[in-house]
């Protein structure tokens, strides 16, 4: 029997929002952005949720998110770090499940279908990430804007979250990365969990189908887009 844990990351500062309220706590249709993904995990077959937030926001999350919305599956609210990988590492310390889904709390439009595909994909392949094929032609350019080349679009995916793994594998990968950083290796440019697996394990990471609506709320316009998608889904 698999035990499934979700880590929801909500420790970002949201500087691109140009708003005093952090993006994960801004409201969409009367509820904070972070609530939407927590609620989806709450009603899914996930067994426990670890919420990772800024140290200064722990009490707020406990009172205004967990207690206010009666979220029973949240096992703990823990402090994140200054970088995403530090927040994930802190969250992994609290995981008791053998499968873990790591999700950006700034992606409020996750749904149960995505969660199920993530779980089943991890059971079959040990490591998987949610994504969607790119629709546009993508080009690489140099610092001055001159085109270097045009990658084959059929091989390109937009990477989303959750990113899901057998817990022992991702813990091992993060441990190895932390050791490298402590040695002073500053050449690492890690932007998501799949990259940690790619860099520090021999396991292949597989894509599972996501949803083009599974956007990350980063700018003020994204709040409007998320509201529109929620309204359309309600019809």
Task: Identify the function of each model-found stretch.
Residues 2-58:
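N-terminal glycine-rich phosphate-binding loop and ensuing alpha1 helix
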Residues 8, 34, 91, 104, ...:
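Residue-level signal for inorganic ion chemistry
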Residues 17, 41, 61-65, 118, ...:
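Hydrophobic packing residues within well-ordered alpha-helices of enzyme cores
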Residues 35-97, 178-183:
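Conserved N-terminal catalytic core of the sugar/cofactor nucleotidyltransferase
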Residues 61-64, 88-89, 112-113, 139-144, ...:
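Short, well-ordered secondary-structure micro-motifs
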Residues 74-76, 82-141, 160:
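Conserved beta-loop-beta/alpha segment of the NTase-like Rossmann-fold superfamily
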Residues 140-165:
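Short, flexible, basic/aromatic active-site loop/helix in glycosyltransferases
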Residues 158-235:
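Conserved alpha/beta core of the MobA/IspD/sugar-nucleotide pyrophosphorylase nucleotidyltransferase superfamily
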